[in-house]
Amino acid sequence: MAIISLAEMMESGVHFGHQTRRWNPRMAPYIYTARNGVHIIDLVKTAQCVETAYRWVRTNAEQGKRFLFVGTKRQAAGIIAEEATRCGSYYINQRWLGGMLTNWATIKGRVDRLKELERMEETGALALRPKKEAAVLRRELERLQKYLGGIKNMRRLPDAVVIIDQKREYNAVQECQKLGIPIVAMLDTNCDPDVVDVPIPGNDDAIRSVKLIVSKLADAIYEARHGAAPVAEEYDYDGAEDEYEDDADEA
């Protein structure tokens, strides 16, 4: 049975790329045509890439490898947290802090601080502090939970990183390259497939497209560890809008 169908990719808008003037020529092998000034991604090739990525991820998960999911754009943030949690992986979905991987010793110190503050909150120790001090500590706790909550159980560097939007997450890509950590990435027509190890061409701006691809990768990890994956719940799209162009400017 196919990992992904052309019909579900069409329905999710996986085939819509960026405006032709904003493309990266290195994505040419994955582009089918252009319509009304917008590149259309070749879904046959996307299906092949999803199949390759699924099997690569599943094989590595079966070997006990650990994965970090990265997607900080608004359309991807909620999906990244949901799917990474479902398959027992780590995630970054707010902001990539410089040195997240290359300066892991320092970042781990902040993670340890997060755990310390959470213990203080759980045991009631925070409530015993002077009101002003407690307020400062709670603000610190909230900030650490926001940026590091998805990796608080990560004891060492991940074995592989799954990235949504290579262009936007270029800092994460550079750190992975520096450390030799394999990258699985969803790539829109403005991205560079040469800087990742396992490319998946697809619309990385539409929520349904991101959800479809990320859920397949999460399924691969879940099935490697637990057997058949449960049917994925429908993502709540309220408060998260599809965008086809705006976020590319930020990268």
Swiss-Prot record:
GO terms of molecular function: structural constituent of ribosome
Keywords: Ribonucleoprotein, Ribosomal protein
Keyword Ribosomal protein in record: yes
Classification via Pfam families: Ribosomal_S2
GO cellular component, one term: cytosolic small ribosomal subunit
Record has Ribonucleoprotein as a keyword: yes
GO biological process, one term: translation
Gene3D superfamilies: Glucose-6-phosphate isomerase like protein, domain 1, Helix hairpin bin
Lineage top rank: taxon: Bacteria
NCBIfam families xref list: rpsB_bact (TIGR01011)
Family: Belongs to the universal ribosomal protein uS2 family.
HAMAP family hit by this protein: Ribosomal_uS2_B
Protein name (Swiss-Prot/TrEMBL): Small ribosomal subunit protein uS2
Organism: Synechococcus elongatus (strain ATCC 33912 / PCC 7942 / FACHB-805) (Anacystis nidulans R2)
Gene, per the UniProt record: rpsB
